[in-house]
């Protein structure tokens, strides 16, 4: 279920996204004054971030059920204040234009059953298996397989969607249960170069769609050995 479209928000409605993971049996959310430090302690980098035009992109993944409980602890104004507080901790994080009221509170109306819902942002997608809690990392082009993309390089806006991936999850679990195998189509350096070039939205989407078609063919054939490197996967596409 995608989030409501955005793009008409006031200029001050910006969110700096931080990657952090809240465990399913985590304790009660910290009090508002301690929230920034709490998230700082849970923030992770390394493989979970990428650099685009000298900005750092972080991915945010939260257990949805816990997130809804967390959201209900605060009012809309407090959440906006929380986001402003977080920007004081992470001065280099990338701005993404988004309506807080449309995004955060729309999650409260989503089903909380067997399907795991995740937020994806930037060039890296990561999901957690709902039953085994094994972690897998997926490249940005997974979005093409799931059928959505909205990229505006010139205005530095990247769409964020919420999606249910139970079917895709089961496919990955059976076909790629070896966690060492990563479904990544682009070498990171190549991916960065695509974004560093001042290209048009249409040109960029054409590039991604071409790679996406290669990726789909790869998924259908399933002939590539599981121990290939990223660049080797591209060659075999």
UniProtKB/Swiss-Prot annotation:
Swiss-Prot/TrEMBL keywords: Plasmid
Source taxon at top rank: Archaea
Listed name of the protein: Uncharacterized protein MJECS09
Organism (species): Methanocaldococcus jannaschii (strain ATCC 43067 / DSM 2661 / JAL-1 / JCM 10045 / NBRC 100440) (Methanococcus jannaschii)
